[in-house]
A protein has these predicted regions:
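Terminal (often C-terminal) interaction modules
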Residues: 1-16, 277-372
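Extracellular structured ligand-interaction cores
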Residues: 74-78, 126-128, 136-140, 168-170, ...
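Acidic, low-complexity intrinsically disordered regions
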Residues: 72-74, 247, 255-256, 260, ...
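Extended, alpha-helix-rich binding/interface surfaces that flank or overlap catalytic cores
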Residues: 138-214, 367-372
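Conserved nucleotidyltransferase catalytic core and NTase-mimicking acidic/glycine-rich helix/loop elements
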Residues: 209-320
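Conserved catalytic core of two-metal-ion nucleotidyltransferases
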Residues: 27, 40-44, 62, 95-162, ...
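Catalytic residues for metal-mediated phosphoryl-transfer on nucleic acids/nucleotides
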Residues: 57, 61, 130, 145, ...
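N-terminal regions immediately upstream of nucleotidyltransferase
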Residues: 1-75, 81-100, 371
Length: 372
């Protein structure tokens, strides 16, 4: 049996290292965040006498952010902007129209983008303001409303930022401006460009994954990143969402595997087809997650079968060379997966055989040509 775990998880020469953002990219994001927060804090306070709070959300908050695979894909950073409102109508919605705040924020960001020589501002997203920093990096800024009395429980210090960011090197551990535990509120509303204010609480899913990563370990986080990178390679556009893949991985992940990331990934892939026969749930919200494209579910099942078969062959088949084994995995993850011509061995044949195998239905053709 081949030892391939380090080819996945090494931050220097492994696959995960290729997925990490570069220091240059982190610096671009870090510098932009400082400018955006200062700009919005000044404009919103001047206009409404409100001090907004900010929270890193999404993949940047989960620490599962990946380098894009294709030129058409982008690095996405989500920065939630939280605003307090004491004036609530009988409907329970802030009296200020959501589009008023969109207009204020859009205008401020457009002026900032010109000043900073960024690529501009996109207003096509109904649920956020999007700042285009470069051709492959953007920052999404959803606007939230929290009842005023509950908003006061969010701790404020150091110019509205709980944690200071000293350098781009500290990006991964100090980028959060507040801790989710400090958000003590019963209701949060998301501004929508066409539908006004909608109930939406990003805290639930963020805290759920923080807890799962803490309980189940860093291997789960890496597995989530491998699956997202696999998705990005197979679907240049569309495909299962990151939340879908992360919830699926968490559901299939029982505990860390001492035999390594290669074996754990194989286990997840082998279990996936049967698990996908029933709905995948967002446990934080107790709701079913659905594919935007109905064909994507079938493709995900077929891709997982093909990947698990090739990964099993790469690990177990001693008749092929180590280079060929790596090339088998590249068929599913792309050239970012490293090629090594001399790999160590490990004796885990019983472990491999104990993992249930799903077979590929070769009678049902794939409806979409696989990327790569």
């Amino acid at each position: 049996m081949r030892e391939m775990s380090n080819l996945f998880k090494s931050t220097t020469n492994g696959f995960i290292g290729k997925l990490n953002l570069t220091l240059e990219q982190k610096t671009v994001i870090y510098d932009a965040l400082k400018e955006i927060k200062k700009c919005l804090s000044d404009v919103i306070f001047k206009e409404y006498e409100i001090h907004p709070r900010y929270m890193t959300q999404g993949s940047a908050g989960y620490k599962t952010q990946n380098q894009p695979c294709h030129l058409s894909q982008e690095i996405d950073y989500d920065l939630g902007c939280y605003l307090p409102f004491s004036d609530i109508e009988e409907t329970g919605k802030p009296y200020r129209a959501a589009n008023v705040f969109f207009n204020t924020v859009d205008t401020a960001l457009e002026e900032l983008a010109i000043k900073m020589h960024w690529n501009g501002v996109c207003k096509e997203k109904d649920s956020c303001c999007r700042v285009l920093l470069t051709n492959n990096i953007h920052i999404d800024i959803p606007l939230y409303s929290v009842p005023d009395k509950e908003f006061q429980t969010i701790h404020e210090c150091c110019d509205s930022f709980r944690k200071s960011i000293s350098s781009a090197e500290s990006y991964d551990i100090e980028i959060d401006e507040e801790s989710w535990e400090n958000f003590d509120y019963d209701e949060v509303l998301l501004a929508h460009r066409t539908e006004g204010w909608k109930n939406s609480d990003p805290r639930k899913i963020n805290m759920f994954f923080q807890m799962q990563f803490k309980m189940k370990g860093e291997q789960l986080k890496r597995i989530c990143r491998y699956l997202k990178a696999w998705r990005d390679f197979k679907w240049e556009e569309g495909g299962p969402t990151s939340i879908y893949l992360m919830c699926l991985a968490e559901d299939l992940f029982d505990a860390e595997d001492v035999f390594g990331d290669d074996i754990k990934l194989l286990e997840i892939l082998r279990k996936m087809p049967e698990r996908l026969e029933t709905p995948v749930l967002n446990k934080a919200e107790s709701e079913e997650l659905k594919m935007k494209n109905s064909d994507d579910l079938r493709l995900l099942i077929e891709y997982s079968k093909l990947f698990s078969q090739d990964l099993n062959k790469a690990i177990s088949d001693t008749t092929i060379s180590d280079k060929t084994a790596c090339l088998l995995i590249q068929d599913h993850l792309g050239v970012r997966f490293p090629i090594e011509e001399s790999l160590p061995e490990k004796n885990i044949s019983e472990k491999i055989r104990s993992i249930p195998i799903s077979t590929v239905n070769t009678d049902m053709p794939l409806a979409r040509v696989r990327v790569g």
